[in-house]
């Protein structure tokens, strides 16, 4: 008899409108999305650990904030890509308050950063995808970029000016 009352009590609670009420307290909705592809692009062997020499520049070339050196062209060649287009997103440590690439060490040149530009020589901020390039019928694509030094403030101080960036291939 007691067992029967327990089942009735549990049934009343389970089917009660209060137990069915939606509460947003402590509720979190997460939506996960992605794609699975048959194959991905590969970076041509010589481009996977690319070194771009930006040259040696006098500080008078970088006298005032915003002054920049001559851009140096470089490209990233992809092969074995799926049909469509590809773009590149560069990542790295940003210079304070900018989307420019910070130098690798604070003991290096001062008040200086590295600007990455797209194939049209427009600034390409870190963490922003470049303009997409069509992949040819053989699955190849070449994406062209430029890089240069840029003064963050007046009075750039001399020294080594190296930085590291990584890139992500985006498929479109």
UniProtKB/Swiss-Prot annotation:
The keyword Disulfide bond applies. Disulfide bonds join 41-81. Keywords: Disulfide bond, Fimbrium, Signal. One of its GO terms (biological process) is cell adhesion involved in single-species biofilm formation. It comes from the Bacteria. Residues 1-21 form the signal peptide. The keyword Oxidoreductase does not apply. Its main location: other. Pfam families: Fimbrial. GO terms for cellular component: pilus. It is found in: Fimbrium. NCBIfam families: PRK09934.1. Belongs to the fimbrial protein family. This is Fimbrial-like protein FimF. It comes from Salmonella typhimurium (strain LT2 / SGSC1412 / ATCC 700720). The gene is fimF.
């Amino acid at each position: 008899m007691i067992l029967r009352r327990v089942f009735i009590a549990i049934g009343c609670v389970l089917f009660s409108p209060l137990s069915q009420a939606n509460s947003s307290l402590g509720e979190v909705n997460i939506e996960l999305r992605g794609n699975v592809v048959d194959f991905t692009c590969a970076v041509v062997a010589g481009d996977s650990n690319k070194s771009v020499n930006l040259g040696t520049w006098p500080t008078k070339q970088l006298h005032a904030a915003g002054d920049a050196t001559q851009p140096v062209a470089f490209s990233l060649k992809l092969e074995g890509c799926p049909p469509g287009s590809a773009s590149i997103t560069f990542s790295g440590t940003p210079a304070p308050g900018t989307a420019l690439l910070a130098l690798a060490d604070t003991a290096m040149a001062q008040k200086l950063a590295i600007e990455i530009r797209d194939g049209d020589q427009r600034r390409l901020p870190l963490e922003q995808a470049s303009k997409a390039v069509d992949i040819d019928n053989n699955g190849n694509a070449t994406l062209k970029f430029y890089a240069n030094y840029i003064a963050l403030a007046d009075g750039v101080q001399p020294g080594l000016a190296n930085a590291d960036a990584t890139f992500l291939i985006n498929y479109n």
